[in-house]
Amino acid sequence: MDLIKIAEEAFATGKQHPSFKAGDTVTVAYRIIEGNKERVQLYRGVVIKIAGHGEKKRFTVRKMSGTVGVERIFPIESPAIDSIEVNKVGKVRRAKLYYLRALTGKKARIKEKRVNG
């Protein structure tokens, strides 16, 4: 067996996360260790891309902090991620939403997909 696969299996978290795609608004609960204290920080934003596959899959979340756009990349199998919650399902036609970086205000909004149920 390949040594890389053995290492990946050893560090796999085994957590189940909900399925989401680009355009969805998600809240990521991320564990942060500061010195000897540990806290959970919630990071809410729009998923602008999902890259990689398998254990190396990662997603980029963009949020507005005041007037500045902040993007953060999270590995999906990170042990520091407590939970991922999907808040809104967006209706987009692209897999990578880089065009949102240039838009501000109401133009940067994403339509919400209606779910019949």
From Swiss-Prot:
Coiled coil: none annotated. One of its GO terms (biological process) is translation. It comes from the Bacteria. Gene3D superfamilies: 2.30.30.790. PROSITE patterns: RIBOSOMAL_L19. SUPFAM superfamilies: Translation proteins SH3-like domain. It holds the Pfam family Ribosomal_L19. Keywords: Ribonucleoprotein, Ribosomal protein. InterPro entries: Ribosomal_bL19, Ribosomal_bL19_CS, Ribosomal_bL19_sf, Translation_prot_SH3-like_sf. One of its GO terms (cellular component) is cytosolic large ribosomal subunit. GO terms for molecular function: structural constituent of ribosome. Belongs to the bacterial ribosomal protein bL19 family. This protein is located at the 30S-50S ribosomal subunit interface and may play a role in the structure and function of the aminoacyl-tRNA binding site. HAMAP family: Ribosomal_bL19 (MF_00402). This is Large ribosomal subunit protein bL19. It comes from Bacteroides fragilis (strain ATCC 25285 / DSM 2151 / CCUG 4856 / JCM 11019 / LMG 10263 / NCTC 9343 / Onslow / VPI 2553 / EN-2). The gene is rplS.
